[in-house]
Amino acid sequence: MANTILKSTTRHIRIFTARVENNDLIADTSQLTLDIDPDNEFLWEQSTIEKIQSRFKELVECHTGADLTDYTLRRIGTELEGTLFSLLQAGELSYNPNARVLNYSMGLPRTTELS
């Protein structure tokens, strides 16, 4: 069980109990690795990435001292997915028109005419 990687996978957020070495995930229960938008569905500004990372750090700190379980990781992943949705709704994040598939997984894009 020592080499098992715990993970949380949502549509746009992946969290692993691992570190990255040579593009491989290596099990490491002392470290969490965050993968944001692995399918490149959105266009990201550095400030928006930093907001997600900051929220991730807050959520991890809230769970300090608790057992690290699949459930805990899923809660953190779900919260981050909600943060991503809020950023999209606020116009701080937009869909990538060059994405492999335009499925608008978090709702249709907002335009000033419809807002």
UniProtKB/Swiss-Prot annotation:
Stated family: Belongs to the complex I NdhM subunit family.
Q: How does it assemble?
A: NDH-1 can be composed of about 15 different subunits; different subcomplexes with different compositions have been identified which probably have different functions.
UniProt xrefs under InterPro entries: NdhM
Q: What is the lineage of its organism?
A: Eukaryota, Sar, Rhizaria, Cercozoa, Imbricatea
The entry's localization annotation reads: Plastid, Organellar chromatophore thylakoid membrane
Could you tell me one molecular function GO term of this UniProt entry? quinone binding
**Pfam family for this entry, one:** NdhM
Entries under HAMAP family matching the protein: NDH1_NDH1M (MF_01352)
Q: Does the keyword Phosphoprotein apply?
A: no
Keyword flag Lipid biosynthesis: no
**Gene source species:** Paulinella chromatophora
Q: Which reaction does it catalyse?
A: a plastoquinone + NADH + (n+1) H(+)(in) = a plastoquinol + NAD(+) + n H(+)(out); a plastoquinone + NADPH + (n+1) H(+)(in) = a plastoquinol + NADP(+) + n H(+)(out)
Q: Which PANTHER family match?
A: NAD(P)H-QUINONE OXIDOREDUCTASE SUBUNIT M, CHLOROPLASTIC (PTHR36900:SF1)
Task: Please give the function described in this protein's UniProt entry.
Answer: NDH-1 shuttles electrons from an unknown electron donor, via FMN and iron-sulfur (Fe-S) centers, to quinones in the respiratory and/or the photosynthetic chain. The immediate electron acceptor for the enzyme in this species is believed to be plastoquinone. Couples the redox reaction to proton translocation, and thus conserves the redox energy in a proton gradient.
Q: What is the official name of this protein in its record?
A: NAD(P)H-quinone oxidoreductase subunit M, organellar chromatophore
Q: How does it sit in the membrane?
A: Peripheral membrane protein
Enzyme class, UniProt record, top EC level: translocase
Main location per the UniProt record: plastid
The UniProt keyword set, sorted, is: Membrane, NAD, NADP, Organellar chromatophore, Plastid, Plastoquinone, Quinone, Thylakoid, Translocase
The EC number of this protein is 7.1.1.-
